[in-house]
């Protein structure tokens, strides 16, 4: 198969979406046997960031450098022309991944939805962000394949977007090899509990902060606000150095930081929410994310059960590989053609 894969999110500082896109691309390349084309309009600066991300990957690049790249991507889908074939020649599959919805004349049409949080909680987001997610939802209804990152999101997409179950494919994210117990550890002289939770309402760091005085520990709480913007390459060090990892999120499509922390050998405290069941499995202490008292008790429990939770977490994390993510994509394309 000749597969055109939208990599435009990799032209920005890396996020969970970008990590998934790069991981799935690497997984498909590792599985082998098919032609992969990285495509999309990007800015001059974005092109440099994207080239860094794709360095060393044997993938054909069809990248168009344009000013106002984000606006260009949105306009391309809104205008419905020119067709993607003009830039890509022929292809069997066109897979778009984020805000860009390119028109096409032929071939299988596939997309990815990471979660439907913006449609569940529109009052928590800027109207423009909600509008963009609504557009993505409309496209999902007309795509041949809709990839999701969990069974939870699959059910959400089927119910809320009325997408037929036979067009939805679950492709779990993988864990990069750099997330492992051995390696450098963050250490500033004070033992700590780590969280990636931010001020975003869904991430729920406010309730975690309210819980912290109740933990009654000499440990300190380390959040992204305490260490500044966390570059992707620093995450393994922060996980490894932690006495425990807390993920008090109110809603997720999957919850990859939980698996990353487990892969680094850290006991985890995770919200008791269906969206995190698949990420945490039975290898974490589950907790009501709205109760500071429950969160404090769960942190104390995770610290006390470290010898039990760490091996369970390591075993659970080994289930998630980018090679398997890539194989699911390729098999899904082949089955649908």
What are these regions (language model features)?
Residues 1-337:
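Carbohydrate transferase catalytic cores enriched for Leloir-type hexosyltransferases
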């Amino acid at each position: 198969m000749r597969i055109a894969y939208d990599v435009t999110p990799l032209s920005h500082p890396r996020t969970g979406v970008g990590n998934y896109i790069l991981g799935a691309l690497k997984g498909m390349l590792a599985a082998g046997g098919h032609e992969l084309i990285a495509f999309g309009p990007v800015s001059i600066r974005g092109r440099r960031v994207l080239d860094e991300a794709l360095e060393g990957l044997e993938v054909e690049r069809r990248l168009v450098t344009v000013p106002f790249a984000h606006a260009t991507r949105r306009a391309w889908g809104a205008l419905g022309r020119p067709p993607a074939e003009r830039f890509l020649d022929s292809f069997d599959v066109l897979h778009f991944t984020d805000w860009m919805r390119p028109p096409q004349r032929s071939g299988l049409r596939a997309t990815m939805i990471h979660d439907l949080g913006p449609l569940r909680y529109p009052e928590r987001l800027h109207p423009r962000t909600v509008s963009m997610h609504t557009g993505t939802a409309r496209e999902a209804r007309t795509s041949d394949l809709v990839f999701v990152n969990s069974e939870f999101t699959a059910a959400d997409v089927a119910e809320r977007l009325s997408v037929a179950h036979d067009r939805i494919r679950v492709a779990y994210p993988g864990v990069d090899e750099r997330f492992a117990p051995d390696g450098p550890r963050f250490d500033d002289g004070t033992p700590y509990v780590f969280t990636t939770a931010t001020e975003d309402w869904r991430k729920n760091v406010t309730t975690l902060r309210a819980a912290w005085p109740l933990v009654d520990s000499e440990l300190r709480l380390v959040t992204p606000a305490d260490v500044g913007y966390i570059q992707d390459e620093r995450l393994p060090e922060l996980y490894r150095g932690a006495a425990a990892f807390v993920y008090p999120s109110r809603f997720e499509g999957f919850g990859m930081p939980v698996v990353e922390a487990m892969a680094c050998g850290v006991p985890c405290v995770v919200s008791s929410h269906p969206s995190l069941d698949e990420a945490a499995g039975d290898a974490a202490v589950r907790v009501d994310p709205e109760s500071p008292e429950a969160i404090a008790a769960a942190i104390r429990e995770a610290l006390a059960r470290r010898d039990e939770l760490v091996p369970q977490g390591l075993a659970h994390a080994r289930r998630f590989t980018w090679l398997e993510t890539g194989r699911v994509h390729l098999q899904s394309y082949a089955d649908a053609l």
